[in-house]
Structures are given as structure tokens and as C-alpha cells.
Amino acid sequence: MDIDIVSVFPEYFDVLNLSLLGKAQERGLLAVRSHNLRQWTHDVHQSVDDTPVGGGAGMVMKPEVWAECLDELLGIPADAPANAHAAPAADSPVLIFPNPSAPLFTQQDATALSHAEHLVFGCGRYEGYDARIPQYYRERGVDVREYSIGDYVLNGGEVAVSVMLEAITRLLPGFMGNADSIVEESYTGENALLEHNQYTKPASWRGIDVPPVLISGDHGRVNRFRRDEALEKTSRLRPDLIARLDCHALDKQDRKTLMSLGWEVSGEHPRKLED
């Protein structure tokens, strides 16, 4: 996978050379390149922003600077005509902008993007980027995606890009030392739940014991305990995920556990009963 990141602080992404991401680059699983947006400016001050049209506080990132940069990284001629009906080619780059006003980035998005061959991330700053930038590239057949990583605002897109990048790349074949480690993680799979609690040795620590079933040696009971714990934990912390489950995919014990937690499971999806 090829990854290009555009930022006014490209050195922020030096951290990507550490840990598993760094090792994955050394092994050739992915190539990460960070670019300074100011490289595509032409004035002495290397300006990348200007005042908002219509007034208002702050500064907005200029479309002409971004366009020169993205034309080069995406391989699009500056005079490429608009085509409202153009569909992105299967192997074309995906252009991604973090945006606090955009849909929430999810594990499902990470999974889908892990199959792309080339990702280009644009890091906004100040009051954000001119809204015509994503519009322009969509009209030229680029797969443009905007994502939020939560209901809050950051100083720039660099943190959000780092979050998305790690979520995506760890799903690449060969990235993780043990591929099974991602199978039961939170939000994984169509019927996603929060992951069950994890424990390690010693079995008793400062007066707190691990659940006895986990040291019973009975793998069937262990699996059932973990499944029930995941259901309980998800019901308590993220009931919205329970409400998305397919009742037809639940086994008898799943149904029993959810009913004990106050869920109706006779329909297509579970429904929380009133207390």
C-alpha cells in the first residue's frame, strides 16, 4: 500500500517510523511519504491560507495550493474536465480529509480502506480547507472521503490522520505478528461487539482474582464466558451496537443473555425494553 500525507507539519509523522508501522515499512508492506503543503506555494511567505469569504474568524486553507499538490499526487492534469458521472477506478487513489463535520470513521471504514492500493491524506489546519477542494476532485472521478474521529475539534488533521492510518494499516496481511489477534477485537465483524475483558498472570493480584472459569481449562466454557461478557459490556457501554445485531445470527445462549440484560430479541434486531 502507498500512503501520501500532506500537512504543513510533515515532521509530525516521523512517529510512523516507530513500532509495528515502522517495521511494516521496513518489510515493504507499505510506503509512507509525508509532504509539506508549502512546497507547492509560490509567494515569499509560502502562504497556504486566506481570510474567509463572507467574513468570520480565522483563516481558511487556499484551494489553489492544495490543487497543485493533489494534482501531482493523484496524477490528474490541471485542466482535467469535470465529469459528474465519473466513477472512481478500482485501483485509483482514495483521497481522505479529516473533518469534524463529516461522518464518524468506523472499523468498517478501516476495513474497506485496507484494501486500497493508494491512500492520500490531506491535513487541514486553521478553520479548515476550502469546501471546493473535495468537490473539485469528486467531479473528476476521485474517490474522496471525509471523516470525523469524534464529536470534538482538534487544532489540525494530523492527529486524526494518525488514528485512521493506524486503524487501516494494522489490517494489512502480514502487518500483525499474529493475525488472530484482530479477529475478536471490538467492532470487528458484521455483528460487532465490544471485546471481552483481558487478563494476564498472576491469577490473583492485590486481592483481585481473575474469573475462575478462565483458568478452568474448559475452552467451551471460556468461550461462552467471554461471549456473555462481551454482550454485557456492549449492552452497558454501547447499547447502540446491540441494537444493530441480527437476531437471526444469535444463538440460544446469546438470546438468553440479552433477555437477562433487558433486551427483546424476537424481532429482526434487539430492542431495549423500558425499565
From Swiss-Prot:
Its EC number is 2.1.1.228. It catalyses: guanosine(37) in tRNA + S-adenosyl-L-methionine = N(1)-methylguanosine(37) in tRNA + S-adenosyl-L-homocysteine + H(+). Gene3D superfamilies: 3.40.1280.10, tRNA(m1g37)methyltransferase, domain 2 (1.10.1270.20). It is found in: Cytoplasm. The keyword S-adenosyl-L-methionine applies. GO terms for biological process: tRNA N1-guanine methylation. Keywords: Cytoplasm, Methyltransferase, S-adenosyl-L-methionine, Transferase, tRNA processing. Pfam families: tRNA_m1G_MT. GO terms for cellular component: cytosol. S-adenosyl-L-methionine binds at G124, I149, G150, D151, Y152, V153, L154. It is an enzyme of class 2 (transferase). SUPFAM superfamilies: alpha/beta knot. Specifically methylates guanosine-37 in various tRNAs. NCBIfam families: PRK00026.1, trmD. Homodimer. Belongs to the RNA methyltransferase TrmD family. PANTHER family: TRNA (GUANINE-N(1)-)-METHYLTRANSFERASE (PTHR46417:SF1). This is tRNA (guanine-N(1)-)-methyltransferase.
